[in-house]
């Protein structure tokens, strides 16, 4: 419940910051900390260096992090101009949050946190020790989680169960699943059922993502 409240508050801030409908834009940050906000069009936001915050709104947007600890926020797509997102982290320890549609999230290098949100998402950890979460606990669309290199934790658990696909890759990986999930044989440890849900909550809480996301909004007035 706490996570849901924080997510709703974050998306409200994104909408308030956006203003009216605008044409698609391309924004490129600096080597310092930047806050880049999209429009209702198909935008491209590029973070470059620094600890950046990239906000997507409606439209088929592409968000690219750079060096530093970046936040890539998929926004709320439940609008006539909504669209799938392509969110790609950079070389730092990034937080990547999908929107309402079918998004592709990539952590890239670094120890990243990725939360797909609603929709049929594809979530890729890349290098590093990543925490990948499909963002839905009450059924819904089917997601694909791919860990990549590193010691990853992947949480496709849902109730009621739905058929998510999980592949692990290099490293020693942990999958916290429900009974409908399809887990590849390269995954070293797999937990299923209520114990998996409890462990997933613990990993998410310890990551501090839903607390630190508001620290990442510190440079919000820029744009």
Regions found by a protein language model. Give the residues of each.
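Sec/Tat signal peptide C-region and signal peptidase I cleavage site
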Residues: 20-26
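Glycine-centered beta-turn/loop sites at beta-strand termini
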Residues: 29-32, 38, 47-49, 55-56, ...
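Positively charged n-region of N-terminal signal peptides that target proteins for export
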Residues: 1-4, 9
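Composition-driven, intrinsically disordered low-complexity tracts enriched in small residues
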Residues: 199-223
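Leucine-rich solenoid repeat scaffolds
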Residues: 156-199
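Bacterial N-terminal signal peptides
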Residues: 8-17
């Amino acid at each position: 419940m706490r996570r849901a409240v924080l997510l709703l508050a974050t998306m409200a801030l994104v909408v308030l910051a956006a203003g009216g409908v605008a044409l698609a834009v391309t924004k490129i940050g600096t080597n310092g900390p930047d806050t880049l906000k999209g429009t209702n069009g198909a935008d491209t936001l590029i973070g470059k260096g620094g600890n950046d915050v990239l906000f997507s709104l409606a439209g088929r947007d592409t968000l690219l992090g750079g060096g530093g600890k970046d936040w890539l926020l998929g926004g709320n797509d439940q609008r006539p101009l909504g669209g799938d997102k392509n969110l790609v982290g950079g070389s730092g320890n990034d937080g990547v949050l999908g929107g309402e549609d079918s998004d592709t999230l990539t952590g890239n290098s670094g120890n990243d946190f990725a939360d797909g949100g609603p929709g049929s998402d594809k979530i890729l950890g890349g290098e590093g020790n990543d925490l990948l979460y499909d963002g839905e606990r009450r059924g819904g669309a089917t997601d694909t989680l791919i860990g990549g290199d590193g010691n990853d934790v992947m949480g496709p658990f849902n109730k009621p169960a739905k058929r998510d696909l999980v592949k692990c890759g290099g490293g020693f990986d942990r999958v916290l699943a429900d009974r409908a999930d399809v887990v590849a044989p390269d995954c070293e440890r797999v937990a299923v059922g209520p114990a998996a849900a409890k462990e997933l909550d613990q990993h998410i809480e310890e990551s501090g993502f839903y607390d630190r996301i508001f620290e990442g909004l510190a440079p919000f007035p820029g744009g």
